[in-house]
Each structure stands twice: as C-alpha cells, then as structure tokens.
Amino acid sequence: MTQCYAEITGWGKCLPPATLSNHDLSTFLDTSDEWIQSRTGIEQRRISHVNTSDLATVAAQHAIACAGVSVEEIDLIIVATCSPDSLIPNIASRVQQNLGIPSAAAFDLNAACTGFLYGLETATRLMQASHYRHALVIGAERLSFYLDWTKRDTAVLFGDGAGAVVLSKTEQKVGLQDAQIGCDAQGRDILAVPKFGTAMDRFDADNGYWAFDFVGKEIFKRAVRGMGAAAQQVLARSGLSTEEIDVVIPHQANIRIIQTLCDLAGIAQDKAFVNIHRYGNTSAATVPIALCEALEQGKIKPHDDLLVAAFGAGLTWGAGHIRWGERITPLGKSDAQLPSCDHTALDLLSKAIEHCKRHQSE
C-alpha cells in the first residue's frame, strides 16, 4: 500500500478589526506600554465583535480559496478552540453550515493553546488511515470573553482571532512528518478557568464572572520544558539537525518563552517567526495565524523544514516537523470578511470592564 501524506495546500486567517493597545489597557489597569512590552513583547491585541465560529468561518474561506478546492471537496473539519460559541452543538458544525459543506465529519477539539497542533496531528493521521481527501483544520478563539479585566497578569496577554489550513492527501512526502504531543496534568491548575462548565453553579446570580487562574512563573518553566523536550524528540525521530530547520513557528504566548525555546533547542532565534507584538496570545489560533503570515511575508520557501511548537492549559504541549511542498502562493483568493464594526475595542469591552470592577469591589 502506497504511503500517503497530508500536504498543507491552503492557509488563511481572520483578525477582528478592533485593536486594544497597551495604552488602552493603561486607562483602566495599573500598567503601561513599557511594562507590558518588556515582559511579554506584546504591543496590541484584537477584540472581536462576533462569535468564535464567525472568525473560524472567515479564516476557513480564505484557506479553501488558497487551496483551490471547492467546499464540496472538504470531508473533514476540526476546530481547535477553548472558547466556543456553544458546547452543544460544536462550532465545527456551525462552520460547516456557514460554508455550505454538505456532509463532512465535523468536531471541536480542546487542547487550549496547543489545540491547532493536536488538530493537525489528528487530521493528518485520519487522512493517512482512512478515506478523507481534504481536511480543514482551524484554530479559533475569542478569549476576551473569559478575562477578568481587573487582573493585569491575564488582561494584557490575550486576544481574539482565527487561522486555518486545508490539508490535501498526496503521495509526496510533505506536510506533517512527525509530531510529539502530550500533557503534564500535574500543572493543570496553574492555567485554568476552573468553574466554567458543569462545575459552575448554574443558579448563582454571579454567573457572569469566573476565575481565570494563571501562575506565570510556573507556566513559563513547564512550557519551556514541555515544548523543548517535544521538539528534541521530533528532531531526533526526523533525523534533522537544528541547522536543517529553516523556520520555527512557535506558539505566540510570550517573547521570552519563544527566545528560551530557541536557545534550549539550539536554533537561531532569527529562524522563529514572531507576531505576538501585533496580536498577543490568541491561544489555538496563534500557530495557524503565524504560519499564514510567514507565508505572506516570504519567510517560508519551497521544501523548507518547519518546526512547530506549542503549549497550553492542561498543561498540554507539543511539537511537530512540517516539510513544506512546492507551492507558497495561493491558488485563489476570497473576499470573505467579518461584518463591519463601528466600535473601538474599549467600546466593545466597556460592560465587561465595569462588571469586573464591580465584582472586585464587592
């Protein structure tokens, strides 16, 4: 039986238009542009005026056009998200409905910030083992929904957005060649929204507020350790030296984590694609957005070897080796875009900010 692979043939992104700058944050938090940039590398982030599935749909439309396939050819949809519009049904079915895809398998996957890499591994192995020809893998988040806007440690970090890729079955040795994904469950409580779901008291009058637990120093240590070990395992199995890695697409959580990951892996920092300054941490969306922009900016060349690495709540972690194919430009383009937004980011967040302030004062 001929070995098959899953080539990335399409890529797309969706960033909501409303931008929340560090200066904007300083109008209601005890922080400053210098404080945020020096610790995270973030200058601004996007705040969505639409649901997560809307972001996912637009990113998917661009990826499908880029791949030059019709929606009828998509037979597998995986949406990686930890901020879905609804738990029942999944938002992959909403994306499928929005796109007019007739009967594809569609499901959500929650591995937090590592979700896209989990989804890429899952889709690739399903395509290799079964009949699927074209898969749509999306990372989409609206994390602004979760945040306590009185807590500086998390309010400055996260943003909203979506990225998507189309995978197409091929006999060429391209696409995700190897991946190492895992979870350090001993650290599951240091990055968590612990009472969102059936753990929540549904009759509590204060259901609009929930804790977002975040232990930054411990997260940093575990993130670097998990991603670094996974990257070393992937490189060893792929038979690649660090010099042979052309581009690193890391999870965009913190510029210091990206730099430390490269140092531990022995890879030059200038090989890492970085856009955290523009969007902050968009969780499962960071890797596909970064991949899309690396292609748009000409950072990825035909036949390049890419190292992808991520970590997230759980604490999930992972790394993967992607061998790029021949094509680095879109076959087609889509004019898909979000509905217009006449509000600033501060306008969109005004009720949430006031609610969080009231809760803190009680």
Swiss-Prot record:
GO cellular component terms, A-Z: cytoplasm
Protein source organism: Vibrio cholerae serotype O1 (strain ATCC 39315 / El Tor Inaba N16961)
Entry-linked NCBIfam families: fabH (TIGR00747), PRK09352.1 (NF006829)
Protein name, per record: Beta-ketoacyl-[acyl-carrier-protein] synthase III 2
PANTHER family given in the database record: 3-OXOACYL-[ACYL-CARRIER-PROTEIN] SYNTHASE, BETA-KETOACYL-[ACYL-CARRIER-PROTEIN] SYNTHASE III 2
Reactions accelerated catalytically: malonyl-[ACP] + acetyl-CoA + H(+) = 3-oxobutanoyl-[ACP] + CO2 + CoA
Family: Belongs to the thiolase-like superfamily. FabH family.
GO MF, one annotated term: beta-ketoacyl-acyl-carrier-protein synthase III activity
GO BP: fatty acid biosynthetic process
Predominant place of localization: cytoplasm
Listed pathway(s): Lipid metabolism; fatty acid biosynthesis
Keyword ATP-binding: no
Places the protein is found: Cytoplasm
Stored Pfam families: ACP_syn_III, ACP_syn_III_C
Protein role: Catalyzes the condensation reaction of fatty acid synthesis by the addition to an acyl acceptor of two carbons from malonyl-ACP. Catalyzes the first condensation reaction which initiates fatty acid synthesis and may therefore play a role in governing the total rate of fatty acid production. Possesses both acetoacetyl-ACP synthase and acetyl transacylase activities. Its substrate specificity determines the biosynthesis of branched-chain and/or straight-chain of fatty acids.
SUPFAM superfamilies given in the database record: Thiolase-like (SSF53901)
Domain notes: The last Arg residue of the ACP-binding site is essential for the weak association between ACP/AcpP and FabH.
HAMAP family: FabH (MF_01815)
Active site: C113, H251, N281
The keyword Nuclease belongs to this UniProt entry's keyword annotation: no
CDD domains: KAS_III (cd00830)
Region (ACP-binding): 252-256
Entry EC no(s): 2.3.1.180
Subunit structure: Homodimer.
Keywords attached to this entry: Acyltransferase, Cytoplasm, Fatty acid biosynthesis, Fatty acid metabolism, Lipid biosynthesis, Lipid metabolism, Multifunctional enzyme, Transferase
Listed InterPro entries: ACP_syn_III_C, ACP_syn_III_N, FabH, Thiolase-like
